């Protein structure tokens, strides 16, 4: 089965093609540039570029639209304008080709695709992106939300600090590079509530003291404290749920320092940690295509329509 996947939840419009026998055949995308996300401007970019991205993916896979058996689209959670456009495109293609169309959950796609790539059995998923920071697991065949941020996502925190330091967008890679030159670990406040966390206090504190320290030390301290906080919760959750495998997903999971710290934590606890390629951690169409295939083969179906606040876990 060949599945075409459309990612359209936020700044990225992606088209991926997944073959049930050969794996990922193509994974093409275009990303909205600029600080923050302006939903309508992002949707305009998607509208302008979708046909080019689609054709590029088909060329990479060396197939035509007629070879597609199923269309999957990210139906949420995400920004309503981009979700509307992406789901409209998917439904239009389905009608034109007379092929079934399935809506899939963006966050579940990140995690199920990561599990597929890692060949993991029963991991704890740490999903770290711009808007989200969540600790997820599969318990009794259902998605279980172990813990999450109670205010802002770690990616948003990093981007906000980067902007306040005068760094260009995207902020994550810039902070990561600056952090390598930092030497002074600044003590930052943080809040853990059970297996939940709050990051707003760190941002407020950095805004107050940013002129007292070098950009390098602020970047270094931000990464060390925030990543340690995330992995502390992950470690506790893994012991609580008796999980032996750890996977980082989402765009922030591209950060090498976070991966190094996760690897060290896993080693100390005799856990298995899976380090995945960055191209499949950021938003992409391949993960949507894969989850579409996986759900469809399991008899799971959701209508392709925008669901900006879609949560399907317990």
From Swiss-Prot:
GO terms for molecular function: iron ion binding; N(6)-L-threonylcarbamoyladenine synthase activity. Substrate binds at residues 127-131, 159, 172, 176, 255. It is found in: Cytoplasm. Binds 1 Fe(2+) ion per subunit. One of its GO terms (biological process) is tRNA threonylcarbamoyladenosine modification. Gene3D superfamilies: 3.30.420.40. Its EC number is 2.3.1.234. Its cofactor is Fe(2+). GO terms for cellular component: cytoplasm; EKC/KEOPS complex. PANTHER family: TRNA N6-ADENOSINE THREONYLCARBAMOYLTRANSFERASE (PTHR11735:SF14). Required for the formation of a threonylcarbamoyl group on adenosine at position 37 (t(6)A37) in tRNAs that read codons beginning with adenine. Is probably involved in the transfer of the threonylcarbamoyl moiety of threonylcarbamoyl-AMP (TC-AMP) to the N6 group of A37. This is tRNA N6-adenosine threonylcarbamoyltransferase. It comes from Nanoarchaeum equitans (strain Kin4-M). The lineage of its organism: Archaea, Nanobdellota, Candidatus Nanoarchaeia, Nanoarchaeales, Nanoarchaeaceae. The gene is kae1.
